[in-house]
Amino acid sequence: MHRLYKKTITYLLSKDFLVTLLVLSIMLAIFWYMLWASQLSRRTILIDTLPDFTIYFTFGIVLGLIFAGRALYSRSVKKKLKHMLEMFLYGFVLGFLSIVNIFDVYVYLFPDDVISYTSDYKIVFPGPSTGKSSRCEAGIWVKDIHTGQFKQLCTNREILFKKRRQGMDALWITARVNKLGTYIVDYRFTYK
């Protein structure tokens, strides 16, 4: 028993275990960030002129080139090209996915102002997509005054029944805004 305990302690303090723990922690943090940022993007409206996809793609290519450059020095000549291509692909995917919602996060974290306004709305069934194969029960289309764009928000029949009364034909929207877009904090049904 003492021998097993000693081996376990030795392994837990080894460099391999600590490196594995560090890599898993970083990957878990990236995964958490991607989930959090994708939730933010459901209520964020970016301006039309922002070349977001080009920036995501460029960042992925740059990170892929960094990974491929690092791989250039680590393999023998026979497998070098294949390893470089694999590392480029890994770097590209990691870079692309980790930055894909960065502008939504920026709008959420760094608002220049908080505004409130009324907007017309339209309720549709079913609502926006919430994943690969699921959808919200209902959706509310609203027009953002700051960007001039329409956004579909997720809701359900129960919320509509509780919060909406006959004759309520507008939404009172509270939003955080900056030069890149709008994050809708809250909305309430109201009378015009």
Language model feature labels by segment:
Residues 111-134:
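Structural detector for short beta-strands of small beta-barrel domains
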Residues 156-174:
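Short nucleic-acid-contacting surface segments enriched for D/E, G, S/T with interspersed K/R
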Residues 176-192:
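OB-fold/S1-family single-stranded nucleic acid-binding modules
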Residues 15-72:
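Membrane-embedded alpha-helical segments of integral membrane proteins
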Residues 129-154:
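OB-fold (S1/OB) nucleic-acid-binding surfaces
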Residues 1-11:
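Short, Lys/Arg-rich, polar N-terminal cytosolic tail immediately upstream
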Residues 79-106:
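Internal/C-terminal transmembrane anchor helices
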Residues 12, 44-47, 73-85:
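Membrane-interface helix-boundary motifs at transmembrane edges
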